Amino acid sequence: MASGILVNVKEEVTCPICLELLTQPLSLDCGHSFCQACLTANHKTSMPDEGERSCPVCRISYQHKNIQPNRHVANIVEKLREVKLSPEEGQKVDHCARHGEKLLLFCREDRKVICWLCERSQEHRGHHTFLTEEVAQEYQVKLQAALQMLRQKQQEAEELEADIREEKASWKTQIQYDKTNILADFEQLRHILDWVESNELQNLEKEEKDVLKRLMKSEIEMVQQTQSVRELISDLEHRLQGSVMELLQGVDGVIKRMKNVTLKNPETFPKNQRRVFRAADLKVMLKKLRELRDVQHYWVDVTVAPNNISYAVISEDMRQVSSPEPQIIYEAQGTISQTFVNFNYCTGIRGSQSITSGKHYWEVDVSKKSAWILGVCAGFQPDAMYNIEQNENYQPKYGYWVIGLEERVKCNAFQDGSFHTPSAPFIVPLSVNICPDRVGVFLDYEACTLSFFNITNHGFLIYKFSHCSFSQPVFPYLNPRKCTVPMTLCSPSS
């Protein structure tokens, strides 16, 4: 309908002489309007008498002095030139803007429609030119292929957009579900786990805010990406439905835009890599805490017993044990050197308490130490002490049930050596998520078990010796190794 109205308006502002839109329109007394150039040319050919002329359309006479520029019609023509009509009734686009000649040729190098004067210009000299009809089919095929590719990309873009929205909804649902469960579990354990609840909810809400913010940004990018492809498709569809001129006009830019279309995948977050604190974690933690509370009922006050064999440095209260500082030795030639005692066998020391029955628990502070060994021993055997240099005596069969740390991170248990190497202990690497600053030791003499707890990590069990052969009294055992930082026996009140 709009196209028909525009066509009618165009007819009203078309010059009856040149049949083109009026240029510098002049109106006569009869109401008809003509281009200034057309009316001037008509005057020269009509040769009027006594200054009277007649309208080329209705033949009504008019005076030359009565000719008036029609600014209203000129404005209508100007607006009409800016309006793009439908393909059936559209404006003529087949004339060269520079030369006014018909655009009948296509320049292969510049991918532009040109006229015969453009072909002879310096700009296109030496270029390969063809009739527009000759290349139209070729570009029809290219644009059709481009359209097909873009439709496929549109489908992919829409699928990516749908996926990101689905993932966004899934994330919101999952996090809401996790939040609800965490709230319910913490409500039951609020009296002992308030700080855990607060910490976990804060982390979860921070994760929700961060992930949803990034997913929202990714969703916006996907929507913009889809819209961009749609707009390019619309442009191509319009060209393919239009005339040859509309198909080829600016085709180079369209092809470049088409080639630059690259779909960006949205940012995703694998849920299986998340670590969500769950009720099971609370139950395990609570169980460990209860186990620790149970064994702490058997806490005994342990101190160390000085002896003439160990080189360990003992504090006045008999609770701290450390390795001696390096000794300075003056050699015969007057040179000075530093040397360490052999810490592997010289710094071990036992507790003063002799254990022959019952349940006993104590804790050892090993914070800031890079190496240590602790547990229980069946008593020192001076003849065997000198064989401990490579940890060879740290075996249950020799009366040592111990675990140790070395190089700050390697935690090991020492079991009996194998059949092939009976003199060397079998080293059991221990998986400790948090390096202990404080270790709890629980001895059940009748059950023949010795357990070690990581007080730093909610009392989780580090290692347990079972079926221990306690055939004689055993004693708490400490060895600070080469690390001069002290290890401290904690009092029950600590």
From Swiss-Prot:
InterPro entries: B30.2/SPRY, B30.2/SPRY_sf, Butyrophylin_SPRY, ConA-like_dom_sf, SPRY_dom, TRIM/RBCC, Znf-RING_euk, Znf_B-box. GO terms for biological process: activation of innate immune response; autophagy; defense response to virus; innate immune response; positive regulation of canonical NF-kappaB signal transduction; positive regulation of MAPK cascade; positive regulation of NF-kappaB transcription factor activity; protein K63-linked ubiquitination. Residues 282-494 form the B30.2/SPRY domain. The modification Phosphoserine is found at residue 86. Belongs to the TRIM/RBCC family. Capsid-specific restriction factor that prevents infection from non-host-adapted retroviruses. Blocks viral replication early in the life cycle, after viral entry but before reverse transcription. In addition to acting as a capsid-specific restriction factor, also acts as a pattern recognition receptor that activates innate immune signaling in response to the retroviral capsid lattice. This is Tripartite motif-containing protein 5. The lineage of its organism: Eukaryota, Metazoa, Chordata, Craniata, Vertebrata. The gene is TRIM5.
